[in-house]
């Protein structure tokens, strides 16, 4: 039986607004991030979600909370959905790291697996725990739709692993998952299909008013 997983990156934080690697550092949401969580909650309330799971980090939990309230569900916190530990890169921007060690950044950009930052969690290990969590959710909710709130790097790595794509190229294959946007996959047994990528949950902006009719 097919299970649909609705993968969502948490709302914006101060570090993400500055393009800093947050990793396992527990950074809370900005006002914009809280608004993204509210939009996700409204979207989930009309989208037929059967269960919700999230990373233990507060930015993911706060993003999942409005959806849980809208649906009357309890959020299942899964340790396997925690963001990758970036080691030396935690709290830094790429430019700051390049200023200190340009060769380390070059290796990372070339292959984020073999060129991972010093002290960081191996990409293969992160992929294994993330996919184990996602498959567990799929197994326990056959035929259901599960909202999963996690992190930009972890979800991209998991997508590569599930779709049989090279882990070290996750940054090139999936350049970015937007805050609060939904990426939908289907899991059926050992097979995974990508149904959509980076679909926004915020309502579209209201159209600008047109010119007044002649004579008004």
Residue ranges and their predicted role:
Residues 1-3, 84-96, 144, 160-216:
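Acidic, low-complexity terminal tails and accessory targeting/binding regions
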Residues 5, 144-152:
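Generic beta-sheet signal
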Residues 6, 76-78, 195:
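General small-molecule cofactor/ligand-binding pocket signal
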Residues 12-67, 113-131:
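Loop-to-helix element that buttresses phosphate recognition and phosphoryl-transfer chemistry
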Residues 13, 154-155:
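Short active-site segment of divalent metal-dependent hydrolases/proteases
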Residues 39-106:
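Phosphate-coordination/substrate-recognition cap region in phosphate-metabolizing enzymes
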Residues 45-48, 137-144:
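Glycine-rich phosphate-binding loop signature in dinucleotide/nucleotide-binding domains
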Residues 56-57, 80, 149-153, 197:
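Short, well-ordered beta-to-alpha junction loops that form the rim of enzyme active sites
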């Amino acid at each position: 039986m097919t299970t649909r997983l609705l993968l969502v990156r948490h709302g914006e934080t101060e570090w993400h607004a500055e393009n800093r690697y947050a990793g396992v550092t527990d950074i809370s949401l900005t006002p914009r991030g809280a608004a993204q969580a509210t939009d996700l909650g409204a979207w989930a309330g009309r989208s037929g979600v059967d269960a919700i799971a999230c990373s233990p980090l507060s930015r993911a939990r706060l993003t999942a909370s409005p959806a849980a309230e809208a649906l009357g569900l309890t959020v299942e916190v899964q340790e396997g959905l925690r963001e990758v530990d970036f080691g030396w890169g935690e709290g830094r921007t790429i430019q700051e790291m390049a200023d200190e060690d340009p060769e380390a950044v070059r290796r990372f950009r070339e292959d984020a697996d073999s060129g991972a930052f010093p002290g960081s969690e191996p990409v293969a290990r992160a992929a294994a725990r993330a996919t184990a969590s996602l498959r567990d959710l799929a197994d326990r909710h056959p035929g259901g739709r599960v909202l999963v709130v996690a992190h930009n790097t972890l979800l991209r790595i998991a997508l590569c692993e599930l779709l049989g794509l090279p882990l070290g190229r996750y940054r090139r294959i999936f350049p970015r998952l937007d805050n609060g946007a939904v990426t939908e996959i289907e899991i059926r047994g050992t097979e995974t299909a990508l149904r959509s990528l980076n679909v926004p949950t915020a309502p579209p902006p209201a159209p600008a008013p047109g010119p007044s009719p002649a004579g008004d």
